[in-house]
Amino acid sequence: MLSGLIKKYNLNNISANYISSQRSAIRLYRNKVVEIIFSEENIDSFDDFLPFADTLKEITFYKCNLSDLSELKRLEQLRDLTLECCSFPHMDVFDNFPNFPALKTLEITKNKNITNLNISSNSIKILNISDTSITNLANVNIPSLKELRTTNNYIKFIDKSFPKLENLYVDFKDFDFYSLKSTPNLRNLHGYNADTNQKLEGLENCKKLKYLDLYNSPFTNFLPFKKLKSLEFLDVQENKIESLKGLEHLPHLKKLYMFYNPIKEISDITPIKNLQVIAIEKHKILKIIDDLNLLGIKYIVLGEG
């Protein structure tokens, strides 16, 4: 069993908890196989892994050629499955993806040939389908999902109900924020690849949204966020913020991170007097440091360069 796997994949480095080669490894716990991490391997069958089905908890395949996934469904104790940058001669596995009763995390990423995912699961909490060509979530039936990552693909709306979803990573360009009505418990939103004419209409319907971060957005002030009354943490680092205009409309905002923006300085404490923490280059707040100290507002200046 294990000896055959060692020989087939040239796993010649043996220690107390790992059997490995330069690119792949098997992790042991109490002499039982619990994790497989394979990189750039040709895996013609999952039959080699079936003897460990009762103990195998985690699998990571990176840049592997996976010829036959039909036996994957027999790994019923699997909790974490990562298929990153892998090739699949038979793509039909994604038309009816196996249901693992114990699976908590599923990552299928960095393969633009994947256009569909048909899956049903009551156990998965985290799903990452970034860098694929999946266009919709109509066939993703995961009612207990708490985190969804969909960056660098073609998903422009949430067309499935995810009542427990709390964390979402999504491309903002052309995204329909009104579709987030399907995620009533969304608390953390991470936005990437914003458009030059980016709008946030519809996002105000996410009444429980507490955390928002944006990367490379076109916004020069805080007016686009003015309807997001529930926000407590806003991260706009490395954006185009030139002024604090609009910040007064965010009454519950506690933390503001804004390193590396073109804003030259803050000379008036009024817009941020309700904050608990501001992260900004020190030279931009020199005029108000005494006021910040008086109000007990912490300032983080690690971004000073």
Describe the residue ranges of each PLM region.
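Acidic, low-complexity, intrinsically disordered interaction modules
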Residues: 21, 25-40, 52
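Extended Gly/Ser/Thr-rich low-complexity repeat segments
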Residues: 46-55
